[in-house]
Amino acid sequence: MMRCTVCHKPYVGPKNHYVCTYCGASIESPVDLEKNPEHLRDVLRKGSEDGIWGYRDFFTVPEDAQPVTMGEGNTPLIHTDRLGAFYGMKNLYLKNETLNPSGTYKDRFATVATTLAKKDGIKQVAIGSAGNAAAAVAAYAAKAGMECFIMLPPGAEKERAWQNMSYGGHFIYGVGGVNDCVKMAEDGEAIFGWKNMCTTMMNYPLACDGYKTIAYETARSMKFEAPDYVVCPVGGGIVVSKVYKGYEEMYALGMIDHLPKMIAVQAAGCAPLVKAFDEGKTATEKWENGDTIAFAIFDPVTFEGVTALDTVRRSGGRAIAIPDDKILEAMRACAKMEAVIPEPASAATIAAAVKLHEDGVIGENDRVVCVLTGSGLRDLKLFNDENADIPSVQPGDMDSLKKAVNHYQK
């Protein structure tokens, strides 16, 4: 049964726009945790060599559907020895989603979405996106042999577009912003018969259950001792809600003894969820004239705002906005100290954890998990000035070589 994520009333609306008609929250298909709880606990304990599909019992997917998979999931949970010590946090962890096949956590959605679409005989898919979602959907469409149309704004970063093009995606520029491109993919569904693969619960709630596996994997890596805080970047708002849902399921099954506080992070230049949280509102409003280097969370409209706000508040967490200079600082620190290059949106989670630690919210010994949702390998231009003054040395000139080495040891 489909129901509202907040008021839990049954959903009886259209099947292409899943929004609660009572409170405006997202819709879900909850797992029956009472049907065979010991089996579900066993699934969680064992984990999976098959990536997220080892947790199939926690999805609403037909039994005869063959997964379209590329080994997504089972990403490492890194205890940050150097980065944590640098910032004064002994238990700072990174859930490194950059190691998914397309370099993003969106693969957890795309594998389920494409599996469901293939089961339904879909031959074409479309998505309005300029970032991680487009990369993931294009990759899995290629794997499934589907044609993929990508609507992206003219200002989209070329590095991200090139990745999508390499998978065979067809580009169509949508005049306007990302939200206009999302609408274009949605409107085209009735005309062209493609499946709109927008990575939101209001579009594809069943596929969004793939994100819950971030929680399952993290808990297993921590021997089912739940973290005190989980820090998630927020654009549309779905990851913070679905990760928490995963923890709620484990708590209900008795696998963990407490629930983490969820921290929702946005860039200061585009922070509709943070604004709504600070003002005590239950829904977000469109953010006008935003600007940030954190392109992956540059969403003026928080599609899952009602559910995300409810999640953060129920968990005892908070929403926080981080300025671009602090995001860039965290991005560079993570690369230098942990050899992980997060995209700016992901680095924002580290910057948020640091800020909350400095403010006394997060303690020195608190267990903090930052979810790094995407790779920064497409954002390397942000490192351009790191080695701007590179010394040159002629072969055999040891004096110049010594000076060159000393140049970096100032």
Feature annotation, model-predicted:
Residues 1-410:
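PLP-dependent amino-acid enzyme catalytic core
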